[in-house]
Structures are given as C-alpha cells and as structure tokens.
Amino acid sequence: MVSHKCVEEFGYASYLVPSNARAPRSARKRRSIEKRISKEDDNMCAIDLLATVAGHLSFESGSSLMSIDKLIEDHRVKEEFPEEEKPLMPVALSPYRGSLSPCGFSSVINGKVENEVDGFSYSGGSDACQVGNFSQDVKPDIDGDAVVLDARPNVVVSLGSSSRTEVPSIGNCVSHGVRDDVNLFSRDDDENFSKYIHPRVTKHSPRTVPRIGDRRIRKILASRHWKGGSRHSDTKPWRNYYLHQQRSYPIKKRKNFDHISDSVTDDYRMRTKMHRGSRKGQGASFVASDSHVKLRIKSFRVPELFIEIPETATVGSLKRMVMEAVSTLLSDGHRVGLMVQGKKVRDDNKTLHQTGISQDNSHLDSLDFSLEPSSEMPQLLTSHPLGHACEELLPVCQATKIDNVLESDHHDSALFPSDSLGNNNVTEDSKAMISVALNELSSQSQPPSRKSRRSEQQQQQAAQRRIRRPFSVAEVEALVQAVEKLGTGRWRDVKLCAFEDADHRTYVDLKDKWKTLVHTAKISPQQRRGEPVPQELLNRVLNAHGYWTQQQMQQLQQNVNKLEQETQSQTTEGLLLL
C-alpha cells in the first residue's frame, strides 16, 4: 500500500490529498491562505512520473480503454442516490474542456504492485480496486480554472475481496489544471467497509489557486478544531472558517497575556516612569533653556536681635516685641543674601547654571539664604524704650575713635558750602542714618513719662555727633582763622570761639579736620580728591601750622631749659647743704 505520509509530503499534480488530512500542530501562523507556486512541475517523484506515462498511454489507446470498461461492467459498484440531494459547490478541474476518459489509479492494499501500462491497474492479490469513470459537464472559469456545473451525488464505494470501484477519469490527467477532487480513503482492514465520496466543496476566488495540493491543504487545515462529517453544516467554506480562527486567536492571546502580566507590568511601568522622569529632570537643566530648578527653603537666617525685657513681662509681650523687631527688619529694606557651599555669591547677574545650581546638582541642600541689612551700619533693634536705646548707643559712640572716621574729610571738604556757620539746614546726604532709626523707634514705642524733654534732646545730639559730615569752605575758613589766633593746641577754645552754635561739630572733629587740611596742603594738586579747597586757605593753613609748630618747639625748649635749671639749682643747693 502506498504510504499516506509519502503522498502528503511528495504530492503530485494528478493526486489530491484526502479531506481528513492531518492539520499542523500549531495554528498560530498568521499567513495568507493561498500562496502562489513559482515552479509547477519541479521535483517530480516516481509515482507522479508513472501517473503521467499512464495518462498519456490511456489517452492514446482508446480501444484498450473500451475493453477495460467492458470488464468493469460485471463488477460495477452499486450507486445509491439519496432522496434529498445536498447542494454541492463547484470543483476545479482542467482549464480546458475535453472528453472524460478513465484515469487509472488504484490503492494497493497488500503492498504488492503489478503495473499494467495499458490500464494502469494495480493488483494486490485477491483484494484489488480499479478505477471507473462518470460524466461531468465542465466549463472554464474566468481565470481558466474549470468549474463543475453538473455533478453527480455522493457515491457509495464498497471495497471487498473482489470489488472494483469507479472514479471519475479525466482526459489528459496530468495537465496544468487544479485537482480538488477528494480521493478515496482506503485503509488496511480485514473486513469490508464503505464510505462516502464527497466532491471537493470549494469556492474559488478569481485569482489563480496554487496547483500543488500539499502546501495548500496544509494552510487550509491549519485549524485545530477541524471536524470531518457528512452534514451540510460541516461543508462551509474552509477559507471563512480559517479566517474566523485567525480573527479570534489574537483576542484570546491578548486577554491571556494581559491577565498574566498585569501585576508584573504595573511595577515595571512605575519604575520606568520614575526613572525616566529623574533622567529627564537631570538632563534638562543642561540642555533646555527653559528648565526650572526646584528649591525648598526651610528657614532664613536673620541678623541678631538684641531684646531685653523684664522678668515680670508676659510671654505675649515677648512675642509682640519679637514680631515688632522682625517686622522692622523686613520693612527697612533688607536684602536677601545667598551662599553656595559656604561661599557668598555677590554677583546678582550670574545665572544659576554658572553659579553651579542645577536640578541634578547635589549641592542644592547646601544653599543658604540670609536677610542682610541694606545699609552698611547694622541697626540695633531692642525692645527698650527710646531712652534706653540711646543710652546704650552713647557709650558705643564714645568708644569709637572718631579720628578714623574724620580722617578722610579733606577729600570732600568743600562739597556743601553754606552762608553762615550757624546754618542748621543740611542736605539729604548729611542726614544721620541713626536718627532715622531713632525716629522709627520713637514712632513705634512711646517714651516713659519720667524722661524729660531735655534728656531726649541731649541723646539725639549725642547720636548726631557720631556721624561724619563734610566741612564747607566757610567752615574751613573759620577753622583756619581760629587756629591762627589760638594755636593748634587749644581745640576746645577753637570750638567755643568758631563753632559754638554748631552742635554737630566737636573739638575732635575740628582737630581731625585741621590735620586733613595740613596733609592736603602738602601734597600736589593732582593727588587731591574731591572738591578743591582754595589755595589761599591752604597757604594760610601751612603758615599757621609752621608758626604754631615752631612756637610749640620753643615752648618745649623753654620748658626743658627750666627743668634743667631747676635740677641744677637743686643740685647746687644740696651740695651747699653738705
């Protein structure tokens, strides 16, 4: 018997694979149902060659075929036609019309093959099967494929010890047409059996169907749910059934995959999102121009606040005092200072990237912000009334060396001229900054009733004296005139003589200003800074300074001489006493 597997693997053009051919194990291949075959008659096997030779010989020898038909008449298979004919779909045959002739093929049961070239019959001992024919009307299809228009009903085939079977035979069996007829199903069995033979029920598309049946049937039978049967419901087109499986399978696969990988995917997506977000934030500070840096300010560093409060005060009063002090700091025009890794950033025009502040920078925690006073002199904010604050300021003024403060007065001594020495009208630049702070403190806190008005004025005058103010030309001229008259060693007398009404001028200020004038007169005019002082006054300063210096030297010499004389007189008196 010819192996069914051999026929399936090495199929030929004149033989068709049975309808219950084995389907592939995997139905997950989503390829097209039909595939064109470039080479039609390549790799022809021995059985295919034998069938071709038999077909040609049977076509040429018509007389021998007629004799074979007569021999078959005695053992013709009984044909039973069912009462209800089932609709059959067209079967593709030869692409051209021709007379139907018996095509010799038989299934060998016992494995012994006797080749009769004329009738192409195989005999296997007592049991054999021969091929007959029946008539069909064939018309060509649009693309050349023949379609069966009038087909006979199902044929009951009985195989026994001496039975012979007739199957349709076509002239020129080995032509280039498509053979979709279902072949006989034979198996090795001791008992007789019968089975229906169904013509192939296939609806052809306008395009050419591949001729090699092996690959085509493999694709059509790709479904795992293939069931063979004789009912009409099972004869639906194979292509639609396969497409249904092709559509339903990805949905099932997707549902199964989502159900399995939900728990795993959620964690992975979350980690990926966080990772991408962090990398994006890191790279954007260097790439994008509109990137932002997120900072969190926990606290500010404020200047020191000196608060003194009696022990009998309440906690609420302490809180109010601290709040007043902080509000005073914020309302006095304080500015914000920035320190990066302990280094103060002074240039406000630098960008954050140039300073080293970026999103991926690890130094964001080392940023320090502080409130700094806008003025150079820090203001002393206390909870004391006005009198106590001024009493604390006064020792500070006395302890400070005003000589250092007034040392540079000669640079801008003539900036603000005035008509008289007693003129108290001063410009905005000459106003004391501490007096502004004192006025603010006085507006916020009321002075106690025990403090007199006179003490307040004295405290204000003491606070005003510690502020350096430039000398006008008139004040310089008055100072020179007083020094020429009284000398350089009598500064208290100079203050009472020339600056009695100027409360903001002390004898120390006058002494420092005189030293500055002497230094300015000794240097060249190119080295002088500020508004120049008239040269006449500078000459008078030099003359007065030289004169009084000489006088002081003479006075000192006289004093030394007196001391020497006294010592000599004492020594002589002592010697006389001895």
Curated annotation (Swiss-Prot):
A N-terminal domain (80-269) is responsible for the interaction with KU70. Binds specifically to the plant telomeric double-stranded DNA sequences 5'-GGTTTAG-3'. At least 4 repeats of telomeric sequences are required for binding. Induces DNA bending. Coiled coil: none annotated. This is Telomere repeat-binding protein 1. Residues 491-518 bind DNA. Residues 463-522 form the HTH myb-type domain. It is found in: Nucleus. Homodimer and heterodimer with TRP2 and TRP3. Interacts with KU70. One of its GO terms (biological process) is ethylene-activated signaling pathway. Residues 440-467 are annotated as: Disordered. Residues 465-469, 511-515, 522-529 are annotated as: Interaction with DNA. InterPro entries: Homeodomain-like_sf, Myb_dom, SANT/Myb, TRP_plant, Ubiquitin-like_dom, Ubiquitin-like_domsf. GO terms for cellular component: cytoplasm; membrane; nuclear membrane; plasma membrane. GO terms for molecular function: double-stranded telomeric DNA binding. Disruption phenotype: No visible phenotype, probably due to redundancy. Residues 293-372 form the Ubiquitin-like domain. Its main location: nucleus. Keywords: DNA-binding, Nucleus, Transcription, Transcription regulation. Expressed ubiquitously. Highest expression in flowers and leaves.
